[in-house]
Each structure stands twice: as structure tokens, then as C-alpha cells.
Design a protein with these regions (language model features):
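Short beta-strand scaffold segments in enzyme catalytic cores
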Residues: 157-160
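N-terminal beta-alpha lobe that positions the nucleotide/phosphoryl donor
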Residues: 1-146, 153-155
Length: 160
């Protein structure tokens, strides 16, 4: 199974496969906006990691290769991309993890695992409960992870 997805891949337009954040980044990229190059690790990889307690066979090598192609040595942003975030009525702002300036394979592996583990965090569970958000199809939100080229911006912002 191919767990890595690029903006051009048809699966990039499935939030259930890549998470909401990568889905919106892919839509912006396809609309012609300047979006830094990125690769998503699919939610299926997260499901496999939870089910088996380890990385899917061969995925770590693929991740390292993709990260090298994104210029890991200059720093990557590792971003959570959950199925339950950036929703119409709930942003989930601050509930999931983002790591900046990741420059080594060891750090990359660690930060991806932290993103995966964050899906089941007490903070996320409390957020879901407080807002009465139910997701009966899974016990915790599915988590994609984004590996994205760093942009060392002078100013940044977000729009809803």
C-alpha cells in the first residue's frame, strides 16, 4: 500500500485519507495558490500504527526518501492533519501538534509518532466531549501527517 500522498494525487482530495488540513492545502495548490511543497502520510498509516504498534513495513524508508526530496537538511514542518479538525463549525485550533525546523531522520520519526499519538490525547478527548462532537466510526480521530518544506516567513496569518 502506498501511504504517501502528494497534492496531485486524487487521494489528496479525500479528507478521510489525508485529514482535513492536507485536503485544504491540496485544494489551494490545485487552485493555483503558492503552497509550499508537501507530502501527506495517510490516515491508513496511522490506523496500521495503532493496530500493530509499529510502522507499516517499508514506510519509514519511504518517509525518509520523501523527506530528503523535500530538503530535510534545511528543515521541514511536520504537521498533524486529522479527520476531525478545520471543520465548518469547529476549528480544533491548538488541539493537534505541529513541529518546525525538523532536520534529522531520528527527529522526523519521533515527531511523526507524536502527531499520531496526539490524536488520542486527553486534550483532544476533552475538546470533543465539551463540544459534543461524536465520531462513532472510530475511538479517536484518524490522523494524517504532513511533511512540508519550511517557509521562514517574516509575517504569517490565517483566514477562515
Amino acid at each position: 500500500m502506498n501511504y504517501l500522498i502528494r497534492f496531485e494525487d486524487d487521494r489528496a482530495l479525500s479528507p478521510r485519507v489525508v485529514g482535513q488540513k492536507f485536503f485544504y492545502l491540496a485544494k489551494a495548490f490545485r487552485a493555483g495558490f503558492a503552497v509550499p511543497q508537501a507530502v501527506a502520510i495517510s490516515t491508513e498509516a496511522h490506523q496500521s500504527y495503532i493496530s500493530h504498534g509499529r510502522w507499516p513495513d517499508g514506510l519509514l524508508d519511504e518517509v525518509f526518501k520523501s523527506a530528503t526530496n523535500l530538503d530535510l537538511s534545511k528543515g521541514l514542518s511536520i504537521r498533524s492533519s486529522a479527520t476531525l479538525e478545520d471543520l465548518e463549525k469547529q476549528s480544533f485550533a491548538g488541539q493537534y501538534r505541529t513541529f518546525l525546523q525538523v532536520v534529522s531522520e531520528a527527529e522526523l520519526k519521533d515527531k511523526i509518532e507524536e502527531c499520531w499519538k496526539g490524536a488520542g490525547s486527553q486534550a483532544v478527548q476533552s475538546y470533543l466531549k465539551a463540544r459534543r462532537i461524536h465520531h462513532p466510526e472510530e475511538q479517536i480521530p484518524l490522523m494524517g501527517v504532513i511533511m512540508q518544506k519550511m517557509v521562514n516567513a517574516i509575517a504569517a496569518g490565517i483566514a477562515f
